[in-house]
C-alpha cells in the first residue's frame, strides 16, 4: 500500500522570515559602534539641513536621544559631542530673528541637564561646545557674532546652575576648571575674542546662578584658575582683560566697591566740589527704619530678568563673597615657584599691594583726588607764561646779548676793567650791566622796554626836542635845499617839455652823489647861486638860460632874482661873492660819474630787464583788487557785538516774514497734474 505525504502549508510571513535569515547569514555582521556613528551622522545632517521644520523636529528628538544614549551600554565620548556640536553650530548659524535665536539658545543650553544625572556627559557636552566655538570663531561674520556670544553666555549660565544643583561639588568644579584650561583658557588660545568674552561674562553669570547661595571658599575655587592665568599668560591684552573683568570686577561688586561707587557718583553730580573724595560723608536721611520697612512692603515688586531688556526691567546682580587671602596666597605662590621677568614681577607685586589694601578694609581702586583748577582767565595765564618766558630768557641770554653789542676791542677792555675776584654766579649779571657804557646801557633798556610792551603793540618813550642825531642818520639825510631852491625846482619842472621825460634818470636829477664827494665844489656852487640871485633885477621877465658845459646836469634850476628889499649878509670871501657880468657857473662832475654815464650809453651784451616791484596781492586783469590784511584776522569780543546791536537794532529774525521772490521761473502748468489728464471724480469726492 502506497502512502503519500501530506502537503505542508507555509504562509507568506514564514517565507519572508526564512528569506531574511538566509540573507543575514550571507552578509557579515556590522559592528554596533559603526551603527551608532551612522546614527549620529544622520542626526547631524538633519540639524544642518536648510529646512527649518526638520531642524526643529530633530532638536525635540535630540533631548530624548541624549537621555537614552547616556543610560545605554555605549556612553558618550568627547568625539561624539564634537560631531553633534558641528550640527548644532549650523543650526544656530541658520537661525533668524532675535526672539527665535534666543529661544534656540535656551533650548541648546538646557540640554546640559538632559543626560539623566550623568555629570561627566554634562561637562563633556559643555567642553565640546567651547572647543567648537574656539575653532569656528574666526568663521563667524559680524551679522552672526551677537547670537553666538549670546549662546556662550546662556551655556555658561546653565552649566553653573547644573553645578549649583550638585551643591558646588569640588570634584566637578575641578574637572570643569581643567577642561576650560584646555580650551578657552589655554596658554596659547586659538581665539582671543572668545577668551575675552568668557572672562567678561563668567563671574556675572556665577552671581546670577548662585543668587547669594555660595560661600567665599566656593568662589575661591572658581577664582584660582584665573589668578594662575594672569601669572602665566604671555598675551598682555588677555592679562589686562582678566585683571579688570575678573579681579577688579569682584572688588567693585563687594560692599567696599559699592560704597565707593555711590560716593563717587554723588561727588560727580555735585561737580567735584572738593579736592578729595574723602571729604564727602554720607548723612542719614532722618527717616526711621520702621517707616522704610512699611514703605518697602507697600511697594510692589518690580519685574526682574537675568538679561537686559527693553523697558522698565531691572537685572539683579547678587554679591559674590570675596576672600582676599586666597588671591594673595596664589599670587605669592606664583612669584615663588615661577621664574618671571621683571615686568611680570612688577605687575604681580602691584596686584599684591592692591589686595593687601583691600584686606585692610580700604578700597584701593578708583579716583580719589581731583585737582581743582585755579580761577584764572586765559589772558592772565598767557601774561604769566609770557612774563616767565621773558624772565627765563633774560636770565639765560641777557649778559651774552649785552656783550655781543660791543666789538672785540671794547669787549676786551670791558672785561679787563672788571675785578673778577669779587664776581660770582649771583652778581655776574649785575657787574656786567654796571660796567657797560651808558650808550649801550640806554639801548639795552630801550630793547627791554620794547620786549615788555610787545603784547600792547605800542612803545611809549620820551623824545627830547634838542636830541642830537647820530652819524648814521646824518649820512643818510639828503642835502637840504632852501625854500627858494625848492620853488625854483618846482617851477622848472612845470616848464619842462614832455620830450624830456624819455631821457635817462641820471640826467633828470641833480647829481647828489657828486656833491657828497666834492664838498668844495658844492660850496662854490651854492655861493655862486646866491651871487647870481643878488645881481638879478626884480623884474618879472623870464630868466635867460645860462650856457652849460658838457656833462652838466640838465635839470639844474635856473637862478632867479630875489624880490627887492631883501637884505643878505655881506660875503665873507670870494666864494660868497655874487657872480659878476660875464661870469658863468660851471659844475665839473667827478671821474666816477663820468665813467658811469659813458658806460650807460654803451650797448649791453645782455639786455637788463627792468626790475619789477613785488606785488602785495596777485595782479588780475580786472580793475578791482583784493588786499588781504592779516591784522584784521582776530577774534572780536562780545562788546563789539553788543555795540553793533545798539547801532543797528533791527530784528535779526522775523517769524512772520514771508520769503522773497524766487529766482526760479514759474512753470506754465500751475500744478503737477498733466493738463491732458482728466481725473475721474468719485461719488464721495468733495472737491
UniProtKB/Swiss-Prot annotation:
The modification Phosphothreonine is found at residues 617, 620. Keywords: Nucleus, Phosphoprotein, rRNA processing. It is found in: Nucleus. Residues 554-564 have a biased composition (Low complexity). Residues 288-298 have a biased composition (Acidic residues). The modification Phosphoserine is found at residue 622. Residues 596-608 have a biased composition (Polar residues). GO terms for cellular component: nucleus; preribosome, small subunit precursor. The keyword Transmembrane does not apply. Its main location: nucleus. Residues 463-488, 497-520, 527-543 have a biased composition (Basic and acidic residues). GO terms for biological process: rRNA processing. The keyword rRNA processing applies. Residues 288-312, 463-624 are annotated as: Disordered. Pfam families: Nop52. Belongs to the RRP1 family. May be involved in the generation of 28S rRNA. PANTHER family: NNP-1 PROTEIN NOVEL NUCLEAR PROTEIN 1 NOP52 (PTHR13026), RIBOSOMAL RNA PROCESSING 1B (PTHR13026:SF0). This is Ribosomal RNA processing protein 1 homolog. The gene is Nnp-1.
